[in-house]
Amino acid sequence: MKKRIQKLTALLLFGSLTVSLLTGCGGGNSGSSGGDGSSSSEESSESSGGAGEVTLWHYFEHEAPDLEAIVEKYNEEQDKIHITATYVSREELMNQYTIGAVSGELPDIGMVDSPDMASYVSLGVFEDITDDVGSWEDLDQFYPGPLLSCQDADGKYYGLPNNSSCLTLACNMDILKKAGFNEPPTTWDEFRKVCEKTTNASDGVYGFAMCAIGTEEGTFQLLPWICSAGGNIDTLDSPESIKGIQFLTDLVQDGLMSKEVINWQQSEAYNSFCAGKAAMLESGTWQLADIDEKINGTFEYQYALLPKDEEYSSTIGGENFGVCTGTEYRDECVDFLKYLMNAQNNADFTAAAAKLPVRKDAVSLNELFTTDERYAVFNEGMNYARARGPHAQWPTLSEAFYTAVQQSLLGEKSAEDAMKDAAATIDPIVAEDPLPEASIGGGVADDVN
């Protein structure tokens, strides 16, 4: 009980500080939310006859119509339940889960950012559906990385993954070529040289833009830099992890990356790149949805893997859906999850949302994943992408990490001292409850190359 209370307290604090995460979580603008931060799909106002009323909460914004189309089709194809899909901002949704863990006021089906699922499972937000999906013949079609995020330490399932994403390097090739570089950098040394040659302080142009904000969004983008050097979040005081953060700190301190990165969400770093104010960007899969529209032909761009030190690295993003504790329609909700994540729906939804499928058999069902060279880079990046957790106290681990990185970037502490201080928080937690072996690679590239 003491551990449960500690986790609940941590999540309450975490939820109050969380901002909308685009990383692997969708993004864009939505005019559909009401004054309370939520909105229901249009079909909610229609008569559902004698079907049981089921609520589904999600924080998809520009992807909402694609999700609602699947929900509407499911409602038409069966008469046991009628699902109402309701948009709730990510921050509010996480708060509602935390409160609902105590009050019991939860939706029937809920969406969650993949690294957060273990935390809410530990609080009892999601139902154990192992008996329903463990023997499901489709389960072996799911990539191991995303699927791992739906399991607890004992291998029990509490949901199904809906989509994946990862991070790569977007390059303004006009700026790079003008500086004498015809190809994107592949190593840290090359990357540093490109940053030096492309930064133009008088024009407000930096060599690199990324998100290092003090939220999970920052952790999402920061992790590849320590992992590429051979570190990880459970070895922050190692020379490898310190090296990764020192590399980023030097970029800021040397004026090659704006100090504003500590305040930027991924969307703001993205906007800076699209406006021609950064030669390179740490970019997420979902940004493929509107990059051409934003750039509007003002410059040539190209995607590449994030530059490496010892090895290539990226971070897995994405969302999961789970059946919430206490629903009257448990079996029906599980049936919908299987429907939502069938091969065709997974292919259609992820293609429309500029994300990556979580199923191997979905890749060949939409030509976008096999013919678009930009997707090919992200698909390759999935082979090096690491899952965040899963861990019941991931919010605590993440906060310790991004807080320390910000202190280093701003020069408040040395990279070494900052990482050692973060390790002092993280090490006792993972000593008692270790992280699982890193799940690397979604396998998507193997199916399209």
Language-model region placement:
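Extracytoplasmic "Venus flytrap"/periplasmic binding protein-like
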Residues: 73-142, 149, 174-186, 279-280, ...
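Short, well-ordered beta-strand elements
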Residues: 49-61, 81-86, 108-109, 158, ...
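Long, aromatic- and glycine/proline-rich binding clefts that accommodate carbohydrate-like moieties
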Residues: 150, 301-304, 351-403, 407, ...
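Short, low-complexity disordered leader/linker segments with a strong preference
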Residues: 1-55, 76, 370, 427-449
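Glycine-centered hinge/linker elements that transmit conformational signals in sensory
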Residues: 194-197, 201, 234-262, 306
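Periplasmic solute-binding protein
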Residues: 117-125, 130, 144-183, 211-233, ...
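Hinge/lid segment of periplasmic solute-binding proteins
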Residues: 113-167, 192, 200-203, 218-221, ...
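Extracytoplasmic/periplasmic substrate-recognition and gating elements
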Residues: 72, 76-77, 177-179, 246, ...
